[in-house]
């Protein structure tokens, strides 16, 4: 089994780190005839397995064709371990037979074995047999294997060369792919390592549960993310089996050899419109690592600040220090409009976070192998050194920014702006009753790449962000929905916070609308809602915890009505604290009656 195996890439590296984990997961069996300390590999970042976990096992000697390796004699030693991925018991056979995996270095004991439970193969690099030191390297998923690998005879069989990288499955594979997976997994669907890739409609439905409005942006992002991970899946499938055919009628047989480039995304919209939430929710739906970076903190190399490689380190940490998982993640770079050449040309100093940072980001966006340094105080030191190699060709980069006054650039390009004061297009739209936000949204719908270049981004940077998504400012109705409807709505969050103290929080309809109007007046979008709620509920949150011991006079409910909110230009009296039983309904009815009377008076005043 050792001679015939040839692996082209590693999926992930799992290093033995925890003594408690080792004593639970690894039971090593040593020979009675073996010397106590046999160096197997050159010393590296070794980790000690406690000697209490050792048992003994007789050495086996394999000669002739005993391992499929000619007529030379090779030593073998067997150990029983628990799989690092699924904890199922598996056999590991160490041998000094040369492997193609390690350049056929002679005299080195090593092992490549397969877990029948999770269909994963591991290459074990021991540095000493007693005490056992080394690390597991996960090679990948194996297709077309039998479940019965517990017998000693199976340990001597050759591994199949048809490797399947863990990833995503698209619906286009149909029933053939399902049958193939069932066969490779022994018919047990719970063991399937390939998860289904959601369709664009399913992704959009997932976004609807958390994000209000921005319907066009949701569709564009859903298609972009689906195509990105479909591209990754088909690329990994093609690598997994060069002999696979996709059973698709194609006019051009050479289309199988076409390489698909990734398409990164640029989100444009005012603050509080949902750019960050959209990117974060997308990563949650497709279940990939997600990292956020602020472009304003990035600087050129050798300057004080964060290098662009720090973005990849954040993604590496979010992926649980798994390089392979990180290489399929999503990175959101916020405030990219702040690193335009225009914003730094007026400073008079060196442009350390403008065009230079854009140049540094080009290779990351396009796709390249980057050496990512590990900080000295990092969460986990990589055993291979002070840096890791990450390939960014499958990382989806989503950039975002407010791009203030970009609509003026669009208007000038359309020759609708007059020299000096005013613009005819804005005048026409304003006289038609459209708000300023509606005017901006209408202009940005016709945004082109040349407008971003005129704004201050370099052409090479814009060219690597082919998908442009414009978001509009949220209106009053949408802000009310943000407060009440999504799964993680702000109103629901504060209700849960008070419920932890057995207190009921209630908002009247008039109060929620007034809160939305106050947020719109601050031009902060949905971000302004939390600060408004904090100011309204601060006094109640201060009083509630101490009222638990007051018995029947303890606080039972907190009411937020229009009086608590105040007006658009002035603060209110704060949330009303209600004590005693059965008082909330009475106050709610009174508050709603007052609000209805005010609405009726306002309507009568407008009609006169």
UniProtKB/Swiss-Prot annotation:
GO terms for molecular function: ATP binding; ATP hydrolysis activity; ATP-dependent protein folding chaperone; peptidase activity; unfolded protein binding. Its main location: mitochondrion. It comes from the Eukaryota. It holds the Pfam family ClpB_D2-small. GO terms for cellular component: mitochondrion. ATP binds at residues 270-277. Keywords: ATP-binding, Hydrolase, Mitochondrion, Nucleotide-binding, Protease, Transit peptide. Residues 1-66 form a transit peptide. InterPro entries: AAA+_ATPase, ATP-dep_Clp_protease_ClpX, ATPase_AAA_core, Clp_ATPase_C, Clp_protease_ATP-bd_su_ClpX, P-loop_NTPase. Residues 143-195 are annotated as: Disordered. GO terms for biological process: proteolysis. Residues 172-185 have a biased composition (Acidic residues). It is found in: Mitochondrion. Belongs to the ClpX chaperone family. NCBIfam families: clpX, PRK05342.1. ATP-dependent specificity component of the mitochondrial Clp protease. It directs the protease to specific substrates. Can perform chaperone functions in the absence of ClpP. This is CLP protease regulatory subunit CLPX2, mitochondrial. It comes from Arabidopsis thaliana.
């Amino acid at each position: 089994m050792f001679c015939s195996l040839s692996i082209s890439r590693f999926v992930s590296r799992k290093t033995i780190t925890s003594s408690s984990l080792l004593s639970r997961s690894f039971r090593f069996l040593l020979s009675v005839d073996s010397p106590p300390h046999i160096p197997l590999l050159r010393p590296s970042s070794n980790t000690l397995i406690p000697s209490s976990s050792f048992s003994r096992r007789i050495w086996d000697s394999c000669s002739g064709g005993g391992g499929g390796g000619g007529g030379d004699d090779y030593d073998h030693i067997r150990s029983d371990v628990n799989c690092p991925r699924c904890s199922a018991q598996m056999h590991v056979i160490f041998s000094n037979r040369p492997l193609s995996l390690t350049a056929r270095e002679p005299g080195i004991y090593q092992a490549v074995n397969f877990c029948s439970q999770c269909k994963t193969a591991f290459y074990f690099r021991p540095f000493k047999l007693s005490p056992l030191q080394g690390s597991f390297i996960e090679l990948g998923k194996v297709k077309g294997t039998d479940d019965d690998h517990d017998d000693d005879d199976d340990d001597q069989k050759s591994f199949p060369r048809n490797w399947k990288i863990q990833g995503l499955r698209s619906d286009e594979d149909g029933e053939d792919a399902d049958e193939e997976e069932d066969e490779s997994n022994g018919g047990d669907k719970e063991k399937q390592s390939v998860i289904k890739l959601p369709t664009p409609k399913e992704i959009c439905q997932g976004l609807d549960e958390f994000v209000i409005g921005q319907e066009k942006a949701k569709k564009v992002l859903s298609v972009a993310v689906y195509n990105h991970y479909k591209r990754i899946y088909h690329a990994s499938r093609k690598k997994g089996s060069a002999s696979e055919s996709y059973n698709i009628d194609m006019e051009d047989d050479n289309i199988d050899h076409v390489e698909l480039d990734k398409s990164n995304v640029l989100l444009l919209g005012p603050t509080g419109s949902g750019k960050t939430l959209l990117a974060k929710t997308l990563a949650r739906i497709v279940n990939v690592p997600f990292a956020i970076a602020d472009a304003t903190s990035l600087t050129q190399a050798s300057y004080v600040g964060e290098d662009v490689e720090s973005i990849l380190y954040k993604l590496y940490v979010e992926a649980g220090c798994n390089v392979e998982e990180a290489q399929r993640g999503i990175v959101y770079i916020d405030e990219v409009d702040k690193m335009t050449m225009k914003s730094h040309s007026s400073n008079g100093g060196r442009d350390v976070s403008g065009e230079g940072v854009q140049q540094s980001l080009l290779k990351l966006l396009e796709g390249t192998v980057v050496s990512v340094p590990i900080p000295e105080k990092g969460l986990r030191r990589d055993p291979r050194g002070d840096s890791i190699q990450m390939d960014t060709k499958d990382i989806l980069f989503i950039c975002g920014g407010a791009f203030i006054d970009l609509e003026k650039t669009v208007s000038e390009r359309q020759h609708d702006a007059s020299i000096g004061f005013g613009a005819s297009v804005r005048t026409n739209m304003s006289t038609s009753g459209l708000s300023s936000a509606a005017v901006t949204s209408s202009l940005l719908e016709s945004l082109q790449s040349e407008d971003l270049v005129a704004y201050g981004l370099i052409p090479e940077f814009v060219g690597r962000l082919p998908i442009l998504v414009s978001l509009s400012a949220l209106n009053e109705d949408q802000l009310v929905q943000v407060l009440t409807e999504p799964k993680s709505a702000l109103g629901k969050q504060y209700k849960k916070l008070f419920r932890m103290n057995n207190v009921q929080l209630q908002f009247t309809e008039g109060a929620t609308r007034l809160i939305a109007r106050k947020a719109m007046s601050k031009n902060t979008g949905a971000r302004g809602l939390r600060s408004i709620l904090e100011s309204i509920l601060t006094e109640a949150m201060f009083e509630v915890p101490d009222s638990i011991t007051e018995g029947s006079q303890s606080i039972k409910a907190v009411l937020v009505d229009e009086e608590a909110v105040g007006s658009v230009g002035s603060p209110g009296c704060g949330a009303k604290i209600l004590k005693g039983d059965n008082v909330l309904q009475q106050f709610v009815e009174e508050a709603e009656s007052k609000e209805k009377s005010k609405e009726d008076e306002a309507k009568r005043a407008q009609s006169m």
